[in-house]
Amino acid sequence: MRRGVRVAHTCGAGKEPVPPFRNQQTGTRCKMSTQSTQSKPVQNVSSGGAFYAGRGVTKTPTISHAKGIFFWDTDGKRYLDGSSGAVAANIGHGNERVREAMIEQAKRFSYVVRTAFTSEATETLCRMISELAGSGFDQTFLVSGGSEAIEATLKLARQYAVVTGQPKRSKIFARIPGYHGSTLGAAAVTGDPDRDQIFGPIMRIMPKIPAPLSYRIPEGYDVHSYADHCANELERQILVEGEDTVLAFIMEPVGGIATGALVAPNSYYSKVRKICDRYGVLLIFDEVMCGAGRTGTFLAAHHWPHALPDLVACAKGLSAGYTPLGAMIAPNRIVDKVVESGGFLHGHTYSGNPLSSAIGVAVLSELVNQDLMENAQRRGVILRQRLNALKDRSTTIGDVRGMGLLNAVEIVEDKATKAIFPASRQASYRASEIARDLGLHIYSRRAASGKFGEWFMAAPPLIITEPEIDLFMELLTETFRIFESENR
């Protein structure tokens, strides 16, 4: 292996940084996401304006300021952030301690290149993440967001296989439906046929197995037997592909927008872990959305201690929307082998950025000091009770599911048959539009052109209080009163 620049991207909890990863620096570009090929309203784009993918919203308000779980537009209208943006703003908006940490670091310096220097903020953040992640999660590799974190796990897994004498292992299994990011490597393990049609020719689409859906279950199964079937499919496909060719299996332990806060039966996690162990397959948890306290524990993986993953990708809540930030969390047993081989062949210009790191330290300090993980667990129970009560009164809410303050509300045309609305109705996006007009932000998705259903995320910031849950439910109830009156 040729020699290259060596970069200390990782640090362990409570100890000196391990020998640095080798790095090949790359530039980064802004990402944009295409949700599907189906017809839906798209924003008007004028010359010189910002360009984003249309998601069913024809005109987006311009936000002026934000505080707590609310933000205000330039016309003075207030919105309750019912989905924490894109399930990112975990500690709410306008936190003064985060702002002060941001200012203090910016006064000192905002950037150094990780091929040559480190910073106190970066080392502190790495230690905090590893300590919160717990035993077996020794090292942290900082990046700028979720897609980059996923890419890092895939590349570390592959390099580990090569340096340990397993070069044939290159196939990464994932679930359908599923979502792991917008970059090409992350898209290759995303279970979305619409995206595959567009981007498949420029990437290597990885094998998929069914996700253990809990609402739309095939005939002849119940929740538990279908979850068993899905786990068995993992083993069957490993044998079909050739066990010595399978590198990893990636999944969200608690689903994000692609599956609507899917939580499988406990037995599924232990069975998947045993299958991966049996065939030498690395288990990767995508905790970009469900990590950083969102489900009531720092990692969603902590709910299943008997089935911990080998690698974790985390983002969103790590910085709570205050800066682009993500992380790969890895054990020494994997990192050490790669480091000993000459270093990790990966990196980004902004990996370990000092300003983002200082913000991350402040955000995680708030998460711990304000006991927000416990609040997520406690308020999540209350919110699901209230959502289920609304479901019982509603003609178009088919299911409520989730864990902590990561929840989804599934929208159907017919509750008896679970039939979805026609694509032309754009039901979940219309519900979001009504909610926004009432002063409530909810994050919606029609998964794979509706093949797997449509829903919105009920995932407010972890700081939410009971009176604020009351207001959330008042606005959501009115949203569905209007929505259902339009669809009688």
Residue ranges, per PLM feature:
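Conserved N-terminal phosphate-binding loop of PLP-dependent enzymes in the Aspartate aminotransferase
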Residues: 33-488
